[in-house]
């Protein structure tokens, strides 16, 4: 990725939009639809680069996936009829694809190799490999920590596992592997992490029990799977950039429709409310994956906040743009307990601080988060996404605080999760 993008957008931002389908749910819907023999339809999926890597891999395994307007039609021969791949399964920049398929392919017992791009090659996999090996998975990485991951057939066993970190990807890798075990698996979480895997298991007829921080699987649960249609809500992680953009840009009034507000993912709404931001939810739906329309209006004099504990996993992917929001508060804000940011596409603690500090903001990285001081855009230094889609979009939102254009290197990284992000932002500028 070498492209540079000059961002020249000014407020106010006004209008009504939808954001692309939720990335986490799209991945899981493709995986479960591919396992189930028959036809499943996924409506309004995210067709960014990450989810396309998941689609490509299941096509190699023998699943037919057709793109039709705003839906995917998945026709599967069933998991028992999957091909043995004769080439490396390329996961690109997708940590979700890599980690969840490490569990799923181990459970299936399909001899395979998972490998991604340079960024994925730097992201540690030991946190996934340890529990999978305790389930008797035959899986190895380079130096036992990194991709490529080499998977060979084995008989998966149930385990009683206490999570070491609040990670939905690690939890989901265990859950996908457990589908093929003759024993139940029990997972004890440290804090509540996003529960899309659990809710979507049920949607595809797979029994699973969750109570508090404990999750219990059913032996050989894969036998219950059935094809299903699934409507993917808008991704709250993508909506977050427009929420913050409207809050910090004078005169803005933006409404985002059909956003997923799963309580394990809605931390940004909680944070904005605690800061006194003008945010309203309406048109709410209930169910396993609730949705709402969200209206956001410019809010001066935002209150500082300390983000820690159980709030962190509920907003983990939004923390870079939340850090930008905190620069506009009237006092110093702190993010704690966010070590998980270190193992994202970049070390997001460092990249958030480094890039925003280049623009004149004042952030101090800590071992587990950030200290964010009230500060303003001071200089139009060239900044860099460092191939991290969320850093690229956060920097584009930061440009709204500048009176001059801002140049962002490697901006095409945003296509990982939000193709069309910049045109949508410009649409709100034009309506404003």
UniProtKB/Swiss-Prot annotation:
3-phosphoshikimate binds at residues 23-24, 28, 167, 169, 317, 344. It catalyses: 3-phosphoshikimate + phosphoenolpyruvate = 5-O-(1-carboxyvinyl)-3-phosphoshikimate + phosphate. Keywords: Amino-acid biosynthesis, Aromatic amino acid biosynthesis, Cytoplasm, Transferase. This is 3-phosphoshikimate 1-carboxyvinyltransferase. The gene is aroA. Monomer. Its EC number is 2.5.1.19. GO terms for molecular function: 3-phosphoshikimate 1-carboxyvinyltransferase activity. Its main location: cytoplasm. Pathway: Metabolic intermediate biosynthesis; chorismate biosynthesis; chorismate from D-erythrose 4-phosphate and phosphoenolpyruvate: step 6/7. It is found in: Cytoplasm. Gene3D superfamilies: Enolpyruvate transferase domain. InterPro entries: Enolpyruvate_Tfrase_dom (IPR001986), Enolpyruvate_Tfrase_sf (IPR036968), EPSP_synthase (IPR006264), EPSP_synthase_CS (IPR023193), RNA3'P_cycl/enolpyr_Trfase_a/b (IPR013792). Belongs to the EPSP synthase family. GO terms for cellular component: cytoplasm. Catalyzes the transfer of the enolpyruvyl moiety of phosphoenolpyruvate (PEP) to the 5-hydroxyl of shikimate-3-phosphate (S3P) to produce enolpyruvyl shikimate-3-phosphate and inorganic phosphate. The active site is at residue 317. It holds the Pfam family EPSP_synthase. It is an enzyme of class 2 (transferase). GO terms for biological process: amino acid biosynthetic process; aromatic amino acid family biosynthetic process; chorismate biosynthetic process. Phosphoenolpyruvate binds at residues 23, 95, 123, 169, 348, 390. SUPFAM superfamilies: EPT/RTPC-like (SSF55205).
């Amino acid at each position: 990725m070498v492209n540079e993008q000059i961002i020249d957008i000014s407020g106010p931002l006004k209008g009504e939009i939808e954001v692309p389908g939720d990335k986490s749910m799209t991945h899981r819907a493709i995986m479960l639809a591919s396992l189930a023999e028959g036809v499943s339809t996924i409506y309004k999926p995210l067709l960014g680069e990450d989810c396309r890597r998941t689609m490509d891999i299941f096509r190699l395994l023998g699943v037919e996936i057709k793109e039709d307007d705003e839906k995917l039609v998945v026709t599967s021969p069933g998991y028992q009829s999957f091909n043995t791949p004769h080439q490396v399964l390329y996961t690109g920049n997708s940590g979700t694809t890599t980690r969840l398929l490490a569990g799923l392919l181990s459970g299936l017992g399909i001899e395979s190799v998972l490998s991604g791009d340079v960024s994925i090659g730097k992201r540690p996999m030991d946190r996934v490999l340890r529990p999978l090996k305790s389930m008797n998975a035959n899986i190895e990485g380079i130096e036992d920590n990194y991709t490529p991951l080499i998977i060979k057939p084995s008989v998966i066993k149930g385990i009683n596992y206490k999570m070491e970190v609040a990670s939905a990807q690690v939890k989901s890798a265990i859950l996908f592997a457990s589908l093929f075990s003759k024993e139940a698996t029990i997972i004890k979480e440290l804090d509540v992490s996003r529960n899309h895997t659990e809710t979507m298991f049920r949607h595809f007829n797979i029994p699973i029990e969750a109570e508090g921080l404990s999750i219990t699987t059913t032996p050989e649960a894969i036998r219950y799977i059935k094809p299903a249609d699934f409507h993917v809500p808008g991704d709250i992680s993508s909506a977050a950039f427009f929420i913050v953009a409207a809050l910090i840009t004078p005169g803005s009034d933006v409404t985002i429709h059909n956003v997923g507000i799963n309580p394990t993912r809605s931390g940004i709404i909680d944070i904005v409310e605690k800061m006194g931001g003008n945010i309203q939810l309406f048109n709410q739906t209930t169910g396993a994956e609730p949705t709402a329309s969200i209206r956001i209006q410019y809010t001066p004099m935002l209150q500082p906040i300390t983000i820690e504990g159980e709030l962190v996993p509920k907003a983990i992917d939004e923390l870079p743009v939340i850090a930008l929001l905190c620069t506009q508060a009237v006092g110093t804000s702190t993010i704690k307990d966010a070590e998980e940011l270190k193992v994202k596409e970049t070390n997001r603690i460092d990249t958030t601080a480094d890039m925003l500090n280049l623009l004149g903001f004042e952030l101090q990285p800590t071992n587990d988060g950030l200290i964010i001081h009230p500060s303003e855009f001071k200089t139009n230094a060239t900044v860099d996404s460092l191939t991290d889609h969320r850093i690229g979009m956060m920097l584009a939102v930061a440009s709204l605080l500048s009176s001059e254009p801002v140049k962002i290197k490697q901006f095409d990284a945003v296509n990982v999760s939000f193709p069309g992000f910049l045109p949508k932002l410009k649409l709100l500028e034009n309506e404003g």
